[in-house]
């Protein structure tokens, strides 16, 4: 899932 990379900035 790309969600991990998107949430990585948080």
UniProtKB/Swiss-Prot annotation:
- State any GO CC term: extracellular region
GO molecular function terms attached to this record: pheromone binding
Where is it mostly found? secreted
- Alphabetical UniProt keywords: Pheromone-binding, Secreted, Transport
Would you say which domain of life the source belongs to?
Answer: Eukaryota
Where does this polypeptide localize? Secreted
* Key word Secreted present: yes
Q: Does the keyword Mitochondrion apply?
A: no
Protein function: Binds pheromones that are released from drying urine of males. These pheromones affect the sexual behavior of females.
Protein family membership: Belongs to the calycin superfamily. Lipocalin family.
Q: What is this protein called?
A: Major urinary protein 2
Query: Per the UniProt entry, what species is this protein from, by scientific name?
Result: Rattus norvegicus (Rat)
Lineage, broadest ranks: Eukaryota, Metazoa, Chordata, Craniata, Vertebrata
